[in-house]
UniProtKB/Swiss-Prot annotation:
Belongs to the methylthiotransferase family. RimO subfamily. Catalyzes the methylthiolation of an aspartic acid residue of ribosomal protein uS12. It comes from Geotalea uraniireducens (strain Rf4). Residues 147-377 form the Radical SAM core domain. Its EC number is 2.8.4.4. The keyword Transferase applies. The gene is rimO. Keywords: 4Fe-4S, Cytoplasm, Iron, Iron-sulfur, Metal-binding, S-adenosyl-L-methionine, Transferase. Binds 2 [4Fe-4S] clusters. One cluster is coordinated with 3 cysteines and an exchangeable S-adenosyl-L-methionine. It is an enzyme of class 2 (transferase). This is Ribosomal protein uS12 methylthiotransferase RimO. GO terms for cellular component: cytosol. [4Fe-4S] cluster 2 binds at residues 161, 165, 168. InterPro entries: Elp3/MiaA/NifB-like_rSAM (IPR006638), Methylthiotransferase (IPR005839), Methylthiotransferase_CS (IPR020612), Methylthiotransferase_N (IPR013848), Methylthiotransferase_N_sf (IPR038135), NA-bd_OB-fold (IPR012340), Ribosomal_uS12_MeSTrfase_RimO (IPR005840), rSAM (IPR007197).
Length: 448
């Protein structure tokens, strides 16, 4: 920077935890270059919006956020508005025309250059855009400013995706699947634990693919074993495990290793074989049912989370009924449902028999109502049991109630546990007796 006065930068990260790690890398670079990071956009000289464009709703949220923050250039101190991530990587030409309020666009391959790019903008009035090949792979030697609470962190073990589902734009935005070297992951994990992290959440587009592209026999199981040996680390959580990549050895490791949360996030998307085939998914209904039975048989009490898509092209009433019955029978602990989003450039966008938006919404509501009943019954079954809970703070309604998450609840996406009695500090992992429940949350007392 040319001035000794520190400029303040604020970053808003949208979308998934993988995006959050990218945002933390950019903040790390900026802090290293003597920018001051603030969480208050009103105080910021530079505002960065790290975007998602996976589905229609994500794109709309990104655009709405950009336009809202663009107003800060008129009524606050902001001098630069920067848009980064998947949205400019995918729509750079359109964004330049439609968003003159934005000063710089940066795609998914140029995060490490963020400070350099800002410097290049000095004295220039025209918009700048940097959207090269999406080949960036995070390295533990890169600066990263952790924005999550001190006791929990995400560890991105790979970038990109090579699964090529027919509805998905991720391979074009993030490139092919590429794993980070094992030694580099372990170095970063040690640094996180040294800073007080108790929970590490492993993330990638598909964590089961880890190591298959590396020489030397690296594997997800090997990584987990190395992480479990770290003193001070208490929870290891596995997010985004494709069903066809879940091996018997991984199941046994989840069962036998105390530090691995008895929790697994498996994006199934559907269960009807004709729909799965059109989605270009590799698992069949029979294989999915067999996997779930094996997981529950080998790991009693495991919490299973999945995501499902309704309204995929060609999804018939019978296909949806099969999906609805599957959710009723399987009783997932957590469930995310998405209406199919017709994304240009994907094979499914050109498929015949597109489902109307009205039908998509009806199916979405039916599936969510069904899951609410499943979740309520499941949570009621936990009353009078004991759970380990990570204390995260106070209830939004009253500071008389602590709140936290059990080992079977992931950050941000799952429910919470509210603590009605007992003392604990933020970041403590304590034993709770569950005394009550709602559709998605639990209530309990700390066991003395």
């Amino acid at each position: 920077m040319s001035t000794s006065i520190k400029e303040k930068v604020s970053l808003v990260s949208l979308g998934c935890p993988k995006n959050l790690v990218d945002a933390e890398v950019m903040l790390g670079y900026l802090a290293k270059e003597k920018y001051e990071v603030t969480t208050d956009e009103r105080e910021a000289d530079i505002i960065i919006v790290n975007t998602c464009s996976f589905i229609k709703e994500a794109k709309q949220e990104s655009i709405d956020t950009i336009l809202d923050l663009a107003d800060r250039k008129h009524d606050a101190r902001c001098r630069l508005l920067i848009v980064t991530g998947c949205l400019p990587q995918r729509y750079q030409e359109e964004l330049v025309k439609e968003l003159p309020e934005v000063d710089i666009f940066v795609g998914t391959g140029d995060y490490p250059r963020i400070a350099e790019i800002i410097a290049e903008k000095e004295g220039m009035s025209e918009q700048l855009r940097y959207t090269g090949d999406p080949n960036f792979l995070y390295d533990e030697d890169l600066p990263r400013l952790q924005s999550s609470p001190y006791y929990t962190a995400y560890l991105k073990i790979a970038e990109g995706c090579s699964n090529c589902c027919s509805y998905c734009v991720i391979p074009s935005l993030r490139g092919a699947f590429r794993s980070r070297p094992l030694d580099k992951l372990l170095k970063e994990a040690r640094e996180l634990v040294a800073r007080g992290v108790k929970e590490i959440n492993l993330i990638a587009q598909d964590i089961t693919g880890y190591g298959k592209d590396l020489a030397g026999g690296a594997s997800l199981e090997g990584l987990i074993k190395e992480l479990a040996a770290l003193d001070g680390l208490q929870w290891i959580r596995l997010l985004y495990a494709y069903p066809d990549g879940i091996s018997d050895s991984l199941i046994q490791l989840i069962r036998d290793e105390d530090k691995v949360c008895k929790y697994l996030d498996i994006p199934l998307q559907h269960v009807s074989d004709p729909v799965l085939k059109r989605m270009n998914r590799r698992s069949s209904e029979a294989e999915i049912r067999s996997l779930i039975a094996k997981l529950r048989g080998e790991i009693p009490g495991i919490a299973l989370r999945t995501s499902l898509i309704v309204g995929f092209p060609g999804e018939t009433d019978e296909d949806f009924k099969k999906l609805l019955h599957f959710v009723e029978e399987t009783r997932f602990d957590r469930l995310g449902v998405f209406c199919y989003s017709r994304e240009e450039g994907t094979p499914s966008a050109e498929m015949p028999d597109q489902v109307s938006e009205r039908v998509k919404r009806e199916r979405y509501k039916k599936l969510m109502r069904t899951q609410a009943r499943v979740s309520f019954k499941h949570n009621r079954s936990l009353v009078d049991t004991e759970e380990l809970v990570l204390i995260e703070g106070y209830s939004e309604e009253t500071e008389l109630l602590l709140k936290g998450r059990s080992s079977k609840q992931a950050p941000d996406i799952d429910g919470q546990v509210y603590v009605t009695s007992g003392n604990a500090q933020i970041g403590d992992i304590v034993k709770l007796r569950i005394t009550d429940s709602s559709d998605y949350d639990l209530i309990g007392e700390i066991v003395p």
